[in-house]
Amino acid sequence: GVGFKAGVKDYKLTYYTPEYQTLDTDILAAFRVTPQPGVPPEEAGTAVAAESSTGTWTTVWTDGLTSLDRYKGRCYHIEPVSGEENQFIVYVAYPLDLFEEGSVTNMFTSIVGNVFGFKALRALRLEDLRIPPAYSKTFQGPPHGIQVERDKLNKYGRPLLGCTIKPKLGLSAKNYGRAVYECLRGGLDFTKDDENVNSQPFMRWRDRFLFCAEALYKAQAETGEIKGHYLNATAGTCEEMIKRAVFARELGVPIVMHDYLTGGFTANTSLAHYCRDNGLLLHIHRAMHAVIDRQKNHGIDFRVLAKALRMSGGDHIHSGTVVGKLEGERDITLGFVVLLRDDFIEKDRSRGIYFTQPWVSLPGVLPVASGGIHVWHMPALTEIFGDDSVLQFGGGTLGHPWGNPPGAAANRVALEACVQARNHGQDLAREGNDVIRRASKWSPELSSACEVWKEIKLYFEAMDTL
């Protein structure tokens, strides 16, 4: 007979190892598993471990040519999710050798590549990953990081201010550059290409880059502050993307931008390497993230996408606002923020952080709050995000009744007032509105902005809760 036992396997025998002690070099994953009716959680959990590592559905004789014990993923713990029927958190440990060094693409292909279509599962969500230093050290990470960015821009002790130029599509390059100049001249640090501004018939990329660079230098000369505009280098091919980044560097601008999920991790990592080699900051937009992370029981939580971005490389990334028009629950969002900025993050289930995450010397990423925010949100944003963040007001700048420069000035005054109040020991959470009101007495621009947006509320319940 053959030298192995043919037939369909019971995954549980090989891949369920509750006695396993995880190694410091293992990549650990926490999956939220919803098994099909009648499938026991151990069976579902081990199926995940197997299919995302060495397993296949039947015994193959080539198994005998390798050491499964060395390479298999192990399901080492299963716990029911409180308050949910038939949902379990399944913990899987993957040996480091399963992954190519320095490749977020390969990491995701392995861990989430196949297993989400598995018949035994009704739904599956990757909640968190623990990236060991042995693996994170194989990545360059963010091109520059928070401290280097502050030194490049010469801006300290406060959040940075941005504005997405609207209408996002349809402006000519010259009119677009005019809006950029007005916002920067009015007091913002950055303006931003919208994520879907690439190179369309009404505004080709090269024209936009030129007019924006002109706007930037003019505003810089007039204000004596360093200014930036996130020039979106996202393109249809990697070669074209790099070509745009090269042109940005030749113009001498400080920062470019990329849509990392639609562009892909391979392209993003290439761009991040180029940016470090050439002194460009890299702003990352997370377009398409909600397709992946919004459903509570299926997909990938954004905290995993945020960790992946820190490895792949980016200096800023959108992380939700807590207060604006888009999804973001406070504790969960703060979980993203600390994972992006800090060197060492303790396990904290109240923020959805399933594992203690050491980043050792990987630079940090500035979280960007953007989407439906205006001057009345400034105290809350300053309080929640702290100094190391970028606050982006698109409509909250360009929607000012007196135009763009006053809109920018209103935001800058509101921010400076909040930072000053905080530094003097005031509690922004409680006294924030008073701080804004007081500041608006000596700033007509702010006073007008306060009037326009005083009643606007964009409140809905968050979909993704703990």
Curated annotation (Swiss-Prot):
The keyword Transferase does not apply. The disulfide bond which can form in the large chain dimeric partners within the hexadecamer appears to be associated with oxidative stress and protein turnover. Substrate binds at N114, T164, K168, R286, H318, S370. CDD domains: RuBisCO_large_I. Keywords: Calvin cycle, Carbon dioxide fixation, Chloroplast, Disulfide bond, Lyase, Magnesium, Metal-binding, Methylation, Monooxygenase, Oxidoreductase, Photorespiration, Photosynthesis, Plastid. GO terms for biological process: photorespiration; reductive pentose-phosphate cycle. Its cofactor is Mg(2+). Its EC number is 4.1.1.39. It is found in: Plastid, Chloroplast. Pfam families: RuBisCO_large, RuBisCO_large_N. Mg(2+) binds at K192, D194, E195. The keyword Disulfide bond applies. The record marks K325 as: Transition state stabilizer. SUPFAM superfamilies: RuBisCo, C-terminal domain (SSF51649), RuBisCO, large subunit, small (N-terminal) domain (SSF54966). It catalyses: 2 (2R)-3-phosphoglycerate + 2 H(+) = D-ribulose 1,5-bisphosphate + CO2 + H2O; D-ribulose 1,5-bisphosphate + O2 = 2-phosphoglycolate + (2R)-3-phosphoglycerate + 2 H(+). InterPro entries: RuBisCO, RuBisCo_large_chain_AS, RuBisCO_lsu_C, RuBisCO_lsu_C_sf, RuBisCO_lsu_fd_N, RuBisCO_lsu_N_sf, RuBisCO_lsuI. Binds 1 Mg(2+) ion per subunit. The active site is at K166 (proton acceptor), H285 (proton acceptor). The modification N6,N6,N6-trimethyllysine is found at K5. The modification N6-carboxylysine is found at K192. RuBisCO catalyzes two reactions: the carboxylation of D-ribulose 1,5-bisphosphate, the primary event in carbon dioxide fixation, as well as the oxidative fragmentation of the pentose substrate in the photorespiration process. Both reactions occur simultaneously and in competition at the same active site. NCBIfam families: PRK04208.1 (NF003252). Belongs to the RuBisCO large chain family. Type I subfamily. Heterohexadecamer of 8 large chains and 8 small chains; disulfide-linked. The disulfide link is formed within the large subunit homodimers. The basic functional RuBisCO is composed of a large chain homodimer in a 'head-to-tail' conformation. In form I RuBisCO this homodimer is arranged in a barrel-like tetramer with the small subunits forming a tetrameric 'cap' on each end of the 'barrel'. This is Ribulose bisphosphate carboxylase large chain. It comes from Drosera capensis. The gene is rbcL.
